[in-house]
Amino acid sequence: MKETSVLTIQNLKACVNEFEVLHNINLQIKTNETHVIMGPNGSGKSSLLKVIAGHPSYKVIEGKIFVENIDITQATPEERSNLGVFLGFQYPIEITGVNNADFLRAVYNQKRKKQGLKDLDPLEFLEILSPILDLVSMDQTFLHRNLNEGFSGGEKKRNEILQMILSKPRLAILDEPDSGLDIDALRSISEVINKLRNQKQCMLIITHYQNLLDYVIPDKVHIMDHGKIVETGDVTLAIQLKRKGYKWIKQSTN
């Protein structure tokens, strides 16, 4: 059976404040695949994610973006979200006065509303949420805290992945989920990501370092530099990068 492409990017060029930041990007992620994008600071990794998510500061000047054959190039962020695009932030924000449980239930009920289903009350939602808490190694005390307030880096990342699971996205985009984590938190987050891969979640992950790939083995690795994808391969590409550094990529593409 032919695999469906969840994300297709064709000849994409984009700018911010009239400055072109992405140049002729081509990318295809098929059903159940996990792709990783790496690159030095300023290479265009985060810009690509923001363009996929529909950030209003970024303008597509050429090319197309498709999610399961639906053209989202000019779609609003809300429309992209409704089509199943989830973007996890590198630094999840803290919101004082917003209970974590209420926020998560609002996320889930919004998804149900789009499907024409009634809202779940707190007890009904807890039945849905409990096994997901186990999946991401979070206990129910997290539910009674303000959103991300006082959370460690690892707790913030797990909480965001929890939001992702509740959203049931077609494509989950994670911006440096390993950022600021110690080795134990990195292992914990990697374990959660691998559990989701086993459940056939399609993911695009941005990372600056190779450490995450010691625990998560992607289907493809893409290297970006100066707003372009300059190399594509499997995880051995990341291993070479760790050994030789980004200067090796610059030399090999010159």
From Swiss-Prot:
The record's listing under InterPro entries reads: AAA+_ATPase, ABC_transporter-like_ATP-bd, ABC_transporter-like_CS, FeS-cluster_ATPase_SufC, P-loop_NTPase
Keyword presence, Cell wall biogenesis/degradation: no
- SUPFAM superfamilies, A to Z: P-loop containing nucleoside triphosphate hydrolases
Molecular function GO labels: ATP binding; ATP hydrolysis activity
**One Pfam family of this protein, by short name?**
ABC_tran
Keywords for this protein: ATP-binding, Chloroplast, Nucleotide-binding, Plastid, Transport
Example GO CC term: the record gives: chloroplast
So which domain of life are we looking at?
Eukaryota
Residues that bind ATP:
39-46
| Boundaries of every ABC transporter domain copy | 7-251
Location(s), subcellular: Plastid, Chloroplast
Chief place where the protein resides:
plastid
What residues form the membrane-spanning segments?
none
Q: Which family does it belong to?
A: Belongs to the ABC transporter superfamily. Ycf16 family.
Q: Which NCBIfam families match?
A: sufC (TIGR01978)
> Could you identify this protein by its name?
Probable ATP-dependent transporter ycf16
List the source organism.
Cyanidium caldarium
Which gene is the coding source of this polypeptide chain?
A: ycf16
